[in-house]
């Protein structure tokens, strides 16, 4: 009996690991264009600002597509659906690698965004299903770890490949790695019938849960604030702090590395007091932004701020996702789809707000505005916490 139990634990952990790898590859491809923007612009003889529109387009496609695409796929067996998503993901990366003009590249990115929309709508609930019985919370932490590793390893490796070969090779390699992950998924995952996915009828039911709606608004507010600053952190460090490109790269690496610590802290502390955990994580996101300009020339302080900020945003993202699942156990996929859409509204809005701040006030002010949006989100958290204290 002990061998059977050990075998179960081993396979369950391997399945969680496959989902973590999947999170890694999806998050890598979402943000790797940032590291390749100049090279892509040069190859198409375009301005970087114009090419950057594909990042905005990606976020908005995910925002608009998450819920309707999840509903369309609600009754499909989950393993089959995942393999289809990876097929679309891989084919779109092949098209990215072969793109003969910017519009073809944009179309390929939209294909990837469609896969992303459904993947993140169903993955959180699935990783909890396949995890060992006593490791559900840790499984969600491992999923977030995969996302963090995309920032630590995925983006730097993507840039290195792009510099050594070309940007097309980066997309080709991502497609190749995704193929290996899909094979692992096909081999390791059991049949996963759709369960508690929810239907279109679930949407009005969820909308009648005020705390859940409050959490979605909180996600939009705090992520908008985060990406108001984070979208332009690289030019801030180079132009305002006047640190070298190598130091800038190291700081971005530290930000990603901090995500690992954030995942660990979530696994250890969230269950003890979820409300305080979310509030503390938000403070870790807000304070470094507000103080970014104040300590702009103190290298070690900026490193510390970046590290704490990275811990905060990773911890907060997982905690809010877990809270959504707890508030909607009867429609986990619909709830996750709305969460993913809300998160990407925050990404797109934050990048837009940051651009407006830079043009109207200057690059040095992004942290103040991003932090101010975060403070509004913190006040909103306080309000819904008091109003729905027993929920």
Curated annotation (Swiss-Prot):
Purpose: Involved in the efflux of sugars. The physiological role may be the reduction of the intracellular concentration of toxic sugars or sugar metabolites.
Protein localization: Cell inner membrane
UniProt entry keywords in alphabetical sequence: Cell inner membrane, Cell membrane, Membrane, Sugar transport, Transmembrane, Transmembrane helix, Transport
A Pfam family of this chain: MFS_1
GO MF entries: carbohydrate transmembrane transporter activity
Top-level taxon of origin: Bacteria
Lineage, uppermost ranks: Bacteria, Pseudomonadati, Campylobacterota, Epsilonproteobacteria, Campylobacterales
Segments traversing the membrane: 16-36, 51-71, 82-102, 103-123, 138-158, 171-191, 210-230, 247-267, 277-297, 300-320, 338-358, 361-381
Bilayer topology: Multi-pass membrane protein
NCBIfam families referenced in this protein's UniProt entry, alphabetically: PRK03545.1
Family, per entry: Belongs to the major facilitator superfamily. SotB (TC 2.A.1.2) family.
CDD domains in the record: MFS_NepI_like
Name of the protein described by the UniProt record: Probable sugar efflux transporter
GO CC, any one term: plasma membrane
């Amino acid at each position: 009996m002990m061998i059977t139990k050990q075998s179960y634990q081993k396979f369950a952990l391997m399945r969680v690991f496959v989902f973590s790898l999947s999170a890694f590859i999806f998050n890598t491809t979402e943000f790797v264009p940032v590291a390749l923007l100049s090279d892509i612009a040069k190859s198409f003889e375009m301005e970087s600002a114009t090419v950057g529109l594909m990042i905005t387009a990606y976020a908005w496609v995910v925002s608009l597509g998450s819920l309707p695409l999840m509903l369309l796929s609600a009754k499909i067996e989950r393993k089959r659906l995942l393999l289809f998503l990876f097929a679309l993901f891989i084919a779109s990366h092949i098209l990215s690698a072969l793109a003969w003009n910017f519009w073809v590249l944009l179309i390929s990115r939209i294909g990837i965004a469609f896969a992303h929309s459904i993947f993140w709508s169903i993955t959180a609930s699935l990783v909890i299903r396949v995890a060992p019985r006593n490791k559900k919370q840790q499984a969600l932490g491992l999923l977030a770890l995969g996302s963090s590793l995309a920032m630590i390893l995925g983006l730097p490796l993507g840039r290195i490949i792009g510099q050594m070969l070309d940007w097309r090779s980066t997309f080709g390699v991502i497609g190749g790695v995704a193929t290996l992950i899909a094979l692992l998924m096909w081999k390791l995952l059991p049949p996963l019938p759709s369960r508690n996915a929810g239907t279109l009828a679930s949407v009005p039911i969820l909308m009648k849960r005020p705390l859940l709606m409050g959490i979605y608004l909180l996600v939009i507010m705090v992520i908008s604030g985060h990406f108001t600053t984070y979208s332009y952190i690289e030019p801030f460090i180079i132009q305002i702090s006047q640190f070298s490109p190598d130091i800038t790269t190291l700081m971005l690496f530290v930000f990603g590395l901090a995500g690992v610590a954030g995942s660990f802290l979530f696994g250890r502390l969230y269950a003890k007091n979820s409300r305080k955990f979310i509030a503390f994580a938000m403070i870790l996101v807000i304070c470094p932004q507000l103080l970014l300009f104040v300590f702009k020339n103190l290298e070690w302080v900026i490193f510390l701020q970046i590290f704490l900020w990275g811990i905060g945003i990773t911890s907060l993202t997982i905690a809010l996702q877990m809270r959504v699942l707890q508030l909607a156990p009867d429609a986990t996929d619909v709830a996750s789809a709305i969460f993913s859409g809300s998160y990407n509204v925050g990404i797109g809005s934050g990048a837009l707000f940051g651009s407006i701040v830079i043009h109207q006030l200057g690059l040095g002010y992004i942290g103040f505005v991003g932090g101010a949006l975060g403070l509004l989100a913190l006040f909103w958290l306080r309000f819904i916490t008091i109003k729905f204290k027993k929920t």
